[in-house]
Amino acid sequence: MKESELIGKVHSAVCHQCQQRGYAAPADVLVDVGVLPKEKYEDWRFGKVRYLEAVCTCNLKKLSFIMKQIRSYAKKSNLKPSFCYYKRWGVKKKHGHKPVIPLRFSKSGNPEIEKAYATHYVDLGRAEQLKKEKMEKAAAVQAGRLDKTSGMPEINISENNNG
């Protein structure tokens, strides 16, 4: 894939994610771009893979380029960086609580690289709009229930005057 095609795919993936949910996550961009199979991502989340880079289908140079393009698009689009702590899925409770097992993104474990992968980019305007839409939808559902019953259970009264 040409560099220009890859840039387009990365920018498109970030834009699409922001439209869908108000933020973009680098790991999801890697899935969308096609360099991280979804099943391998899930294996990593469940702790079956030591680090995320190991299951990506491209070399570290290309991964680094993709990460740079994500940051570039985020800066250009005024997306707010927000660190997200990634922990293992499917951890069983011990002594009443789940132990938190952090996930690793890179082979090196370099804190700057780890932070770059774990940083989500938030479209504050779109996130607020999605939150508002969700609240309006919940209110409409609630209002629909109340309209049908006028806040009270429906009672059918029939009069039989056979007198």
Predicted regions and their residues:
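Alpha-helix boundary/N-cap detector
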Residues: 1, 5, 9, 58-61, ...
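Positively charged, polyanion-binding regions of nucleic-acid-associated proteins
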Residues: 4-27, 36-37, 43-55
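The alpha-helix within a helix-turn-helix
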Residues: 30
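Phospho-regulated, low-complexity intrinsically disordered regions of nuclear gene-regulatory
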Residues: 39, 60-163
